[in-house]
Amino acid sequence: MFRVANPSTRDPKRSRVFVVVSRQLLIDSNFSTVICAPVYTKYHGISTQVPVGVEDGLKHDSSIHCDELVSLPKTSLTDYIGSLSADRLNELKLAMKIALNVEG
């Protein structure tokens, strides 16, 4: 997870945490961007959101929103927050499958 300063002109926050969801091959490639899921303090309990919190390196309870994927420049991913646990990563994988309507 990374905190990104000024993520977009439409985002009211000065910074936002994002989780990189691109595959490692893309992350390690010469492509300049990666796909990320934003983290918001709102949690609606839907299957495409993954609850995260202090135990994941955040200041307060939040959720990863897999329905709102964005492409971010790799150069903006400089403020490392932390990694997801294996259990949380499995929850994220399931939420991504649901959000993208992918079976398997």
List the model feature ranges, each with a label:
Residues 1-104:
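Conserved functional hotspots at enzyme active or ligand-binding sites that engage polyanionic ligands
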